Amino acid sequence: MGRTYFVEEAVGRYLSDLSVKFKPYVTGLLIGQCSPQRDYIIRAARTPPKEEQKEGNTSPSKLDSIDEEWFTAHASQISRMLPGGLLVLSVFIIATPELSKDCQNTLRKLIFSIEKSLTKRRLWKPADEDVSDRAALQICSATKKIVCRTYDVQDPKGSAKPADWKYQSALSASWLSLGCTVNVNIHIPLLATSPNHDLEKNTKNGLNRWSKQIEDSIFLINGQVKDNDIELLEGQKKLRGNTHSGTQIFDVKVLTQLSQGSSHRSTATVQVCSGSINLKGAVKCRAYVHNNKPKVKEAVLALKRDIINTLSDRCEILFEDLILNEGRCKKNFERVYHVLPQRLFVPFAGSNVMLSDYKFGDEAAGEIQERFVEMLDQFVQAEDIHIAEEVNTVGICSLSEKMDDTQLEQLTKATLLLKLQQNMGVVIAVAVAVFASIFSFNYFSD
């Protein structure tokens, strides 16, 4: 028996409009949530036209002219704009009858291309209960006939399976929301033995280690540790103060493991470092889960992935911005601070789920509005843009002269990293009030 996709009625109206406006075909992405029992589609977005296509509402006449790289880049951009629990779940083609016989092969190719691209960027590990089926939706623009099939992205040689496509009103109008603030303080050493420092690669390696801590953390939901296999709403009373527009909100605290047990011993290692990357700040995280008796483990998993994704995505955006505006970072600063982009949330009609995006301090609301139109084909009112985090001013200090041998020796001693036995029994916590997520590069010249 194939999977069943429950689809927001507004998605059906959007697809119907596209079938009238664009000929001979139009492609796009479908956004939703997987669960063991059923899947949900709550949003659709057509592929943005390339520059040469913006003059008119026409597409190339053949499906083999679809730019796979452009399509995949769109999926990567959209994945950054999704809170925890949501993912790019499906691809669609609306085409004339003349092109129908080639649609499924094209959809299959696009599904696996997207999965390959998104998997490269992920820092979290797939769970055993993750659903690996992705839908390929084909609609005939003349007859409106719908063909929905699924492909298992873990099985490239597998064949398509039929799936049901059912529209439902107010599908995500009362989904459950989980939110938390995570304080981040990540130190990533840059080894002196490395001939040159690939900052992006080193940052990703550091985030990989940090993501394992998040995955091993304990999550308190409304102040309680809940068993993974119970329903999220079990024992939960719906209070007036805990709802907003039909949304039940859960406040989550993340308890990160600071030390391992005495059975986990490690030998001391010394690393001589010529610099470091430090990530410090507080990040706002949010996840949504369906209201069809979700389990605690579904909700916690969605929030864990949002925590990991939001920090990883911000670092990617920052590096892209540095390369675009400044060229590759040069190793000529003693200490350089960069502010990571802030997170923001925007609503969309008919749902209590909010979409996400990121902005640098100098970005105007108009730029954010343009991005939502281009990426999600959605107009956003400026007053509906909710900035989740505040920003502090940071400075840049440059190295004016080379250090002598004595200074270098002192500096080297100061940057020795000792991985000592982890059951020391004493933990010193230093609280730092940081409102923004601040990204600092520390460079030490030799």
Curated annotation (Swiss-Prot):
Cellular compartments per GO CC: membrane
The protein's name in its UniProt record: Protein odr-4 homolog
GO biological process: protein localization
Transmembrane in keyword set: yes
InterPro entries tied to this protein: ODR-4-like
TM helices/strands, residue ranges: 81-101, 424-444
Source species: Gallus gallus (Chicken)
One of the Pfam families matching this protein, by short name: ODR4-like
Compartment(s) where it occurs, according to its Swiss-Prot or TrEMBL record: Membrane
UniProt function note: May play a role in the trafficking of a subset of G-protein coupled receptors.
